[in-house]
Amino acid sequence: MAVAALICLVAVALGAPQAASQATPQTSEQVFKNVQVLKGIPVDDFMGTMGIMCAALGFDCSECHAGAGTDKVDWAADTPKKLMARKMVRMVTAINHDNFSGRQMVTCWSCHHGRDRPATTPALENVYGPGSQEMDDVLTQMPGQPSADKIVDKYLQTIGGTERLAGLKSFTAKGTSVGFGGFGGGGKVQIFAKFPDQRATVIDFPDSPERGDSLRIFNGHEAWMETPLTILGEYQLTGGELDGARLDAQLSFPGQIRQVLTNLRVSMPVTISDLPGPSSQTSNQSSMVAVGQDRIVDVVQGTTPRGTLATLYFDKESGLLVRMVRYGKSPIGRVPTQIDYADYREVNGIKMPFRMLFAWLGGRDAIQLSEVQTNVPIDAARFGRPAPSKGH
């Protein structure tokens, strides 16, 4: 599922990949061919929309695009399922417009839940079984819960205290990464972060240097993403994912959490389980991401100045941040991105996560760090637009 969704997201480009370099960001119909409905939106929002469709219906690219997965693919060709998808987008838009004043109350996921055709009859095991564990995207302050300040203060104190955190101005990290199954194994990861809002994650694949690197970069104003083995390759983030990249960079320095997220509210505590790692993990890599560990967490949600929702999950016992889910935008619903944090270790008086699982609708990257250095000089070029990939 993850492999299919990722391919669906990143391989539908038929226009020129160099569009990202334009001063004025190009829209979906300028980069992709035969776009009939999802016009006028940034490329990253368009790709997020493809991810929602894949996840909601359990599809991969080949379900809608003729020849996907082969060298004879015709991305622009109209197929019955692509035509139906356009009808569904129009239908969902009309439902929300006519009944909810345009708010996105109904999405593909509302009905499909991973099925091609929505279920129409309730299963008794669901009627009389445990209730749904799915949380609302937008949370409200629940009475009787500790204040957001108390939860955040406990977290900051646990990882080193505000004074030490205020002194954290940069860090670099090295380790290994395992991606989604179709990527053919793991790579070496480097992370560069500079206060207050610059971050670059670089994953290279020494066993397959021809494929190029996987990159996520935010320089404080602009962001780029590059995924190997795709037609689109490197592209600039200008839609909802731009704010997501900014938030990831800012939260690399936890001392500014209350400046980054405002209107903090606390929901009910919940029990969460670790997200399984990528299917490509081998037995000797499986320890990189714990699976099946349950923990009770305090749930705090805030909003960025640009309106992006972010939900933070703090371990109720230790106070550590163990998960962050942020929501991008698309014409047919919010696009979730989840980062799980574990294996906190002390580095110069500050506890930092050495294990991270970065998951989006198109795949998962499991990262295990082996080395972190704080307050080291970082070349500004690390946060610049990436050079053309070796694979393109």
Where are these regions (language model features)?
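N-terminal cleavable signal peptides for secretion/export
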Residues: G129-K188, P388-H392
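N-terminal mature ectodomain segment of secretory-pathway/periplasmic proteins
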Residues: Q157-I231, N263-G277
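Mature N-terminal segment immediately following signal peptide/propeptide cleavage
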Residues: P25-A66, A148-L168, T172-G175
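Gly/Pro-enriched, hydrophobic low-complexity segments
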Residues: P209-G212, G292-S389
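Gly/Gly-Pro-rich "capping" loops immediately C-terminal to redox-active cysteine motifs
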Residues: G40, G69-A94, T120-E134
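The canonical Cys-X-X-Cys-His
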Residues: G58-A68, M105-R115
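Acidic/charged, solvent-exposed loop-and-adjacent secondary-structure segments enriched in E/D, K/R, S/T
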Residues: W224-Q256
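Bacterial N-terminal signal peptides
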Residues: A2-A13
